[in-house]
């Protein structure tokens, strides 16, 4: 067989693979990935975490207030926030611009280690999961995403509990300024509720691994379908269609994952805040699901969903794009 026939056969094989959804990573590329410097994923994750935290904080405050409001309604408190724009307007009117950045410190402290751990574990697992699932990229990416998500969630859950408490402080009434910063919040939660309270919402957070199990395999799949190149030439890359392909893959994968898994965020937020509901209801998943459905119906599990999409989709784009380009730059830097 001549070189032309070889090339045609290779192209046909590649096209057939793509059509069938088989995106097995070539052996040579596997070896290169396995020899990659672990510092690259860790530092890239930390940088993307810092950028994401600063971007999402105002949206996170609005989302958290809307999610928590459903629990306040169950305890017969008045409804203070109405819709996405109404929530922003109310926070700005009552608390000023600073109100939109409540919890920024724990958000930054949370995002940096979360994404640093997540991407380090995810990259590490992907190096070896392709050998375990050589013909199923979905299972390879999903198992890596779930493992990384579980480890980072358990490691950083206390920070997110603190962040939720700080974001819910309005300076008015029941949610007045009870906590005076990150360290003070940690101290008061441990003193008043015990260290166990720092792991409130861990079960629904772990159930939220479904989010990354959908998002990251879909993200990797879309990158391939859109023809995204893993080239490390950063200078020309950002001006090419490669950059647009990465943005589109980030957006679509996050929108799908968020739509499917949003109810777990509602439950996690409500388990993490303080309320007048008995602990047997608020701190346990099934009773909380029942009372949420009874009081608010199915819509209660999607309270603040529009705000969440406005927050998570741009955050996913910033996170993944900054991670990919940091990784490209650092790969050449550490060579």
Swiss-Prot record:
Major localization listed first in the record, in broad terms: mitochondrion
Signal peptide as annotated in the record: none
GO annotation, cellular component aspect: mitochondrial inner membrane; mitochondrion
Alphabetical UniProt keywords: Membrane, Mitochondrion, Mitochondrion inner membrane, Repeat, Transmembrane, Transmembrane helix, Transport
Record localization: Mitochondrion inner membrane
Catalytic activity: dAMP(in) + NAD(+)(out) = dAMP(out) + NAD(+)(in); dGMP(in) + NAD(+)(out) = dGMP(out) + NAD(+)(in); GMP(in) + NAD(+)(out) = GMP(out) + NAD(+)(in); AMP(in) + NAD(+)(out) = AMP(out) + NAD(+)(in)
One example of a Gene Ontology biological process annotation: NAD transmembrane transport
Membrane topology qualifier: Multi-pass membrane protein
Solcar repeats: 36-128, 136-225, 241-329
GO molecular function terms listed in the Swiss-Prot or TrEMBL record: NAD transmembrane transporter activity
Gene3D superfamilies: Mitochondrial carrier domain (1.50.40.10)
Keyword Membrane: yes
One Pfam short name: Mito_carr
Membrane-traversing stretches: 42-62, 104-124, 142-162, 198-218, 247-267, 298-318
Protein's job: Mitochondrial inner membrane carrier protein that mediates the import of NAD(+) into mitochondria. Can transport NAD(+) by unidirectional transport or by exchange with intramitochondrially generated dAMP and dGMP. Also able to transport NAD(+) by exchange with AMP, GMP or deamido-NAD (+) in vitro.
Further details from the record: Present with 1630 molecules/cell in log phase SD medium.
Family in the record: Belongs to the mitochondrial carrier (TC 2.A.29) family.
Name of protein: Mitochondrial nicotinamide adenine dinucleotide transporter 2
Species lineage: Eukaryota, Fungi, Dikarya, Ascomycota, Saccharomycotina
Encoding gene per record: YEA6
């Amino acid at each position: 067989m001549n070189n032309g026939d070889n090339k045609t056969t290779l192209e046909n094989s590649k096209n057939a693979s793509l059509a069938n959804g088989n995106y097995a990573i070539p052996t040579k590329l596997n070896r290169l990935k396995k020899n990659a410097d672990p510092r690259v994923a860790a530092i890239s994750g930390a940088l993307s975490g810092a950028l994401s935290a600063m971007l999402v904080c105002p949206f996170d405050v609005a989302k958290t207030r809307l999610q928590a409001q459903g629990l306040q309604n169950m305890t017969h408190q008045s409804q203070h926030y109405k819709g996405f724009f109404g929530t922003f307007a109310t926070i700005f009117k009552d608390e000023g611009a600073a109100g939109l950045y409540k919890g920024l410190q724990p958000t930054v402290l949370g995002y940096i280690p979360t994404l640093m751990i997540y991407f380090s574990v995810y990259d590490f697992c992907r190096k070896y999961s392709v050998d375990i699932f050589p013909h199923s990229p979905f299972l390879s990416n999903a198992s890596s995403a779930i493992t990384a998500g579980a480890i980072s969630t358990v490691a950083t859950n206390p920070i997110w509990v603190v962040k939720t408490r700080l974001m819910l402080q309005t300076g008015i009434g029941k949610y007045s300024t009870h906590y005076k910063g990150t360290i003070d919040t940690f101290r008061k939660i441990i003193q008043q509720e015990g260290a166990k309270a720092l792991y409130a919402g861990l079960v629904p957070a772990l159930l939220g691994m479904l989010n990354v199990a959908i998002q990251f395999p879909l993200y990797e799949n879309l990158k391939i379908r859109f023809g995204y190149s893993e080239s490390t030439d950063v200078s020309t890359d950002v001006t090419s269609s490669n950059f647009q392909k990465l943005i589109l893959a980030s957006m679509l994968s996050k929108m799908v994952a968020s739509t499917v898994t949003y109810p777990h965020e509602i439950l996690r937020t409500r388990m993490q805040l303080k309320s007048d509901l008995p602990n047997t209801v608020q701190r346990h998943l099934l009773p909380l699901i029942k009372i949420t459905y009874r009081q608010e119906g199915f819509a209660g599990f999607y309270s603040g969903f529009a705000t969440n999409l406005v927050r998570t989709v741009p955050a996913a784009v910033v996170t993944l794009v900054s991670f990919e380009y940091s990784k490209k730059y650092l790969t050449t830097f550490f060579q």
